[in-house]
Structures are given as C-alpha cells and as structure tokens.
C-alpha cells in the first residue's frame, strides 16, 4: 500500500471512529431517562425511592425487591415468615439464604447471579470475600442483561478493584447501565465528564438523574450553578423534575413505614 493510500485509510478509520463516538453519545443522551422496571415494587408497581436498597427489601426466594410500604402492609396482615410477593417461607440463616440464591443461579437467573456476585464481593452470608469470583458472576449476569451487574463492573474496572484498572472499560459498562435507566451510573457519567473538564455535558447527565429523583445530582447541579457552569433555568428544570419524581414515589404506606423505623 502506498503512503498516500495508507494515509487515506487511516483518515477513514479516524472518521469512522469519530462517527461511532458521536452516535454513541447521541444514544447515551437520548435514552435511559426513565428508571428500569426492576426499580418498581412488584406489589404496588410504584418506583421505589432512592436509594433503592434503603427503601426496599430483596427477597431471595423470587429475587424481587418489595418496597417498605408493601412490606409493612404484609406485616400488618400477619405475614412475618413468608415473602410478601411469592409467599415462600423466608430463610432464617445464611445457609438457607445461600441455598435459595444458588438454586436460582443454577437456572440462569440474572438477578440471582448478580446478587451472588454482590455477596462474594462483600464476603457476606458466610462466604469468604472473593472479588475475582464476584467479577466472574457479574460478567455472566451482565451478559444476561443485568443492569446492576453492569454498574458493579463499571466501578471495579474504573477503580481497578480486584482487576487491572481499565477506565475505558469501566466507562463502557457505566454507559450501558445508564442507557437502561440506572440512576447511579448516569450520575457517575456526569462525574467523569466533570473531571475531564466537560462541564456542559456533565450537567446534562446530572439533569437526567436529578429528574429521576436522585438528590445528589440535584445538589451537584446547584453547585455548578453557583460556580457558573450551569444556567439558572437548568437548575430550576432539574429541581422541578426532581420534586415530581420524588412525589410520584411517595405513598401513605411508605411514609408510615419510614415513621415507624425512624
């Protein structure tokens, strides 16, 4: 190949890469504006308040997160030893809990595989902490479509925790989760852009996550407004969207559950 032909080919490759990057950015900003169905309580069908883990309980029998409001309602009906959703008897120790998870893992349940990865990562349920095993499980769950697994992989690759640091790979997993409505992943993309000096793009990411009810994103936009990196109209829009999202997640049962636990 002549020098001229090689230069043309290289220019074409660069142009193709730039086009692919632009297309990805367009898809990234156009999708993931609504939280995934997995963030809804399977009983009342309302989105669970953020952070999800603090306002719901995972039931390993069916791998469904039930909001604290529906959990309270179940207790008020005398359901203390069975799952509010599938009515299976609840496990009472680590061994039986792990057995329930493993049973669903063996059937290829992406939520169970992701959940088991979490347990290995933190060394819970009597399991020895094993980050490598956690990453294996998260990778399998991500291939099956688990949004949570994409998020977890984004963190370990970006930080190099238990695996060789690979920030582009971490960002890739973060983008995949964000495009499916994962709030924390969307917020983290804003952090990445902020650290790269792309303040306008960072605010756009935080606008999306703030409108989904994520308070840290709203607070960050407020700080960006004070620093002159965000317009007053952007903060006002984010605040209105945040309030609407929070209001939609409220219910009398949930408020009662919070009152009883505080």
Model-derived segments and spans:
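Short cysteine-rich clusters marking metal-coordination/redox-active sites
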Residues: 41-44, 58-59, 67, 83-86
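TPR/TPR-like (Sel1-like) alpha-helical repeat modules
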Residues: 199-218, 222-251
């Amino acid at each position: 190949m002549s020098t001229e032909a090689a230069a043309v080919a290289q220019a074409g490759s660069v142009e193709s890469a730039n086009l692919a990057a632009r297309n990805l950015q367009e898809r990234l900003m156009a999708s993931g504006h609504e939280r995934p169905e997995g963030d809804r309580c399977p009983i009342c069908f309302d989105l669970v308040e953020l952070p999800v883990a603090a306002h719901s309980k995972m039931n390993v029998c069916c791998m469904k997160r039930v909001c604290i409001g529906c959990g309270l309602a179940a207790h008020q009906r005398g359901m203390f030893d069975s799952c509010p959703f599938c009515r299976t008897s609840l496990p009472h120790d680590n061994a039986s809990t792990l057995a329930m998870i493993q049973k669903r893992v063996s059937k290829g349940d992406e939520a169970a595989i992701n959940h088991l990865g979490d347990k290995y990562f933190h060394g819970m349920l009597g399991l020895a902490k094993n980050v490598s095993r956690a990453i294996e499980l998260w990778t399998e769950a991500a291939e099956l479509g688990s949004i949570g697994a994409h998020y977890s992989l984004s963190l370990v690759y970006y930080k190099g925790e238990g695996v060789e640091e690979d920030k582009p790979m971490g960002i890739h997993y973060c983008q995949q989760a964000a495009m499916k409505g994962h709030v924390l992943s969307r917020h983290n993309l804003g952090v990445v852009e902020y650290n790269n000096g792309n303040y306008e793009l960072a605010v756009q990411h935080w606008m999306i996550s703030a409108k989904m009810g994520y308070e840290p994103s709203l607070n960050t936009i407020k700080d960006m407004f004070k620093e002159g990196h965000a317009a007053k109209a952007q903060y006002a829009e984010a605040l209105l969207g945040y309030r609407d999202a929070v209001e939609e997640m409220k219910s009398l049962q949930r408020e009662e559950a919070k009152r009883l636990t505080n």
